[in-house]
């Protein structure tokens, strides 16, 4: 990554390698799980412009020259879809609070704003830095220092091909809520607010 700061924005240049093949100006690319638009292309080097709101909501404002990022091109009709649908519309950030490495596995615990936890459910989907993951467990740490948390497991292959292999405690990641889960939770919540729980059967 190369970074050019602006007054209320910044531009980054990312070397996409082979993923730049066939990429056109105006195409969408997920950088660390954030949907960005390619504005200039020079071989495998692609320039993206990032507005102030995106910098505030995501971790892109923390990027420095030489940073490694997860990259994903947009899906095409007919592509195999593994995991769940990821749009690149980031809700906010989560922070790694613990990393455990049992044999042949890696378990990371993340903390985030409590408002998002209503959409983060055990065995549900979540996207972190653009990686489709399954939530293993959720909970709340009691005060003092209480926080809402969730865990995800990483197999060695995921650690190898993504930046999670170099993450450490305290690092922040971009958090995207599964839109289907969010829709269901919001629909039920609004129904209960309008009709009350006595109408459920």
Tell where the protein language model's regions lie, with residue ranges.
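Conserved loop->alpha-helix
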Residues: 1-201
